[in-house]
């Protein structure tokens, strides 16, 4: 058997002895101590950046719609934005395409000049996710090759370059450059989603590890809310939209992730080295630290499968459909798009805060499974069936659907989103976590791509086109979200368990790692 690190038994998911828990309780740092904040700071900056780039899509599409409507009332606002197909003619702002200016041509060629088509919107929404999927694939190799701290710096540099590309794309209204920038920032985010939770998992005190772990999702929701709040400010305040420089507002909105990327680089430069190290010699064997080749992919098939199921719960229950298309969804429910988007994201953040005290009282498994069941039921019985045309009256439908979305988001943030990145680590033994967590994160990005690309197209198609009743398509899609969530819930109820680090010694007597995992116990928390 390959030699293991001596301190593996002290990993955050290890089961403590009868006296270890009391000792840890007495000697552990406080949640707001400098020692703990020095570890948790990576969740703050990384989660906020992750959330902002997620919330970026809905706001950008809304601001871009305003920029391309050519309803500006001043020559400066209209004439200065020829890149959006607008020109000043006498006293009015018109489309450069004469057919559009006449207002009598209903052809698609004219309509497509306003905002993006559903296909272009879907591609734009999933561009970052494609990059994230690639980033998650290489994250494991990046961690074992460069270590956690250097990977942190690599992420910050990649995201900074991506933000510069986006700024250039906005200046020239280049859709393809914009998508390229989103792919690049997704590449950084894909690595980030494995590196940052792993750094906390390996370096936080055992008592605080799970509470620190859920901070990644908490600050992800904060980043999403910040994007929605800034979008509301840019859309509603200052000069009216008819007189404003919308391209300038898009530049301001896109400058925030650039600032966060630079801040991430500065944090990474002064971040202390991780206690977990991975090293290999030329023969692929460990020459120090943990051996990343200790477990093969075949030995981890069952944990990998359950990781994919948790990723399905995270993405295929529709959370990103709500996040990316919140303005359109809330508008269909009779609300102002930008205000509705902000209210959804603010509620998303507030509910995520509840996960911190819950993590000190319940296991990650208990939180994840319970909340996944509730979220799936909300999709099916409140967001889906009542919204279908003819099932309920308009006022009742809007009230029930709004309540359903609110409860769905609450259940998701209480346990599904907050526990996912912790479970992506806990499902695997420490030496396999670079590979295992990268795979799980990759799967959630694959599912994310499917949702972002197919949600607008499927909703529109089921509704009978852009002019059809959009409630029909939205209802059918949310019913599917609920059914998928319930299927995943059944699998998780019977088979989702964290890796049992306390049974490592069984391998010395011939028991294979996969056999150890089939009957594990839950990871304990300070109060459970």
UniProtKB/Swiss-Prot annotation:
Q: Name one GO cellular component term.
A: plasma membrane
**Can you provide one Gene Ontology molecular function annotated for this UniProt record?**
hexose transmembrane transporter activity
> Cellular location of this protein?
Membrane
Cytoplasmic face residues: 1-43, 140-151, 197-213, 272-301, 360-367, 425-438, 497-528
The domain of life is Eukaryota
User: Topologically, how does it sit relative to the membrane?
Assistant: Multi-pass membrane protein
Extracellular face: residue ranges? 65-118, 173-175, 235-250, 323-338, 389-403, 460-475
Annotated region (Disordered), positions in chain: 1-22, 507-528
- Enumerate the UniProt keywords alphabetically: Membrane, Sugar transport, Transmembrane, Transmembrane helix, Transport
Predominant location category = membrane
What transmembrane ranges does the database entry give? Answer: 44-64, 119-139, 152-172, 176-196, 214-234, 251-271, 302-322, 339-359, 368-388, 404-424, 439-459, 476-496
Protein family: Belongs to the major facilitator superfamily. Sugar transporter (TC 2.A.1.1) family.
What is its biological role? Answer: Facilitative glucose transporter.
Q: What is this protein called?
A: Glucose transporter 1E
**What gene is this protein translated from?**
THT1E
């Amino acid at each position: 058997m390959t030699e293991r690190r001596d301190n593996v038994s002290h990993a955050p998911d290890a089961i403590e002895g009868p006296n270890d828990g009391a000792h840890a309780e007495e000697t552990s740092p406080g949640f707001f101590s400098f020692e703990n904040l020095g570890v948790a700071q990576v969740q703050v900056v990384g989660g906020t950046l992750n959330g902002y780039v997620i919330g970026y899509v809905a706001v950008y599409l809304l601001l871009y719609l305003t920029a391309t409507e050519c309803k500006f009332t001043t020559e400066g606002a209209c004439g200065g934005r020829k890149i959006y197909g607008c020109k000043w003619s006498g006293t009015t702002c018109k489309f450069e395409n004469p057919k559009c200016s006449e207002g009598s041509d209903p052809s698609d060629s004219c309509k497509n000049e306003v905002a993006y088509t559903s296909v272009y919107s879907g591609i734009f929404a999933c561009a970052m996710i494609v990059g994230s999927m690639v980033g998650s694939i290489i994250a494991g190799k990046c961690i074992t090759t460069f270590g956690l701290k250097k990977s942190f710096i690599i992420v910050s540099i990649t995201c900074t370059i991506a933000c510069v590309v986006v700024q250039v794309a906005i200046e020239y209204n280049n859709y393809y450059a914009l998508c390229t920038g989103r792919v690049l920032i997704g590449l950084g985010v894909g690595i980030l989603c494995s590196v940052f939770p792993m750094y906390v998992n390996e370096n936080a005190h055992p008592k605080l590890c799970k509470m620190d772990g859920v901070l990644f999702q908490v600050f992800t929701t904060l980043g999403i809310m910040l994007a929605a709040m800034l979008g509301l400010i840019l859309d509603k305040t200052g000069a009216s939209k008819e007189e404003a420089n919308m391209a300038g507002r898009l530049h301001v909105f896109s400058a925030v992730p650039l600032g966060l990327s630079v801040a991430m680089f500065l944090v990474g430069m002064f971040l202390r080295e991780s206690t977990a190290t991975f090293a290999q010699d030329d023969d692929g064997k460990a020459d120090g630290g943990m051996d990343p080749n200790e477990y093969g992919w075949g030995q981890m098939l069952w944990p990998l499968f359950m990781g994919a199921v948790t990723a399905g719960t995270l993405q295929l229950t529709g959370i990103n459909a709500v996040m990316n298309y919140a303005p359109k969804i809330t508008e269909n429910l009779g609300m102002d798009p930008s205000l509705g988007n902000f209210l959804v994201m603010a509620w998303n953040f507030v509910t995520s805060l509840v996960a911190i005290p819950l993590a000190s009282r319940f296991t990650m498994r208990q939180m994840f499974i319970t909340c996944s069941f509730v979220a799936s039921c909300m999709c099916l019985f409140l967001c889906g069936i009542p919204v279908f045309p003819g099932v309920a009256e308009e006022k009742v439908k809007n009230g029930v659907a709004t309540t359903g979305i609110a409860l769905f988001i609450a259940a998701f943030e209480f346990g599904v989103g907050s526990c996912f990145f912790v479970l992506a680590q806990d499902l695997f033994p420490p030496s396999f976590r670079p590979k295992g967590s990268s795979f799980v994160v990759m799967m959630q990005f694959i599912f994310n791509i499917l949702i972002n690309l197919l949600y607008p197209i499927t909703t529109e198609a089921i509704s009978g086109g852009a002019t059809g009743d959009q409630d029909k398509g939205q209802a059918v899609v949310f019913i599917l979200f609920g059914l998928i969530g319930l299927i995943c819930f059944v699998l998780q109820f019977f088979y989702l368990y964290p890796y049992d680090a306390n049974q490592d010694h069984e391998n010395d007597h011939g028991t294979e790692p996969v056999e150890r995992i089939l009957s594990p116990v839950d990871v304990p928390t300070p109060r459970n």
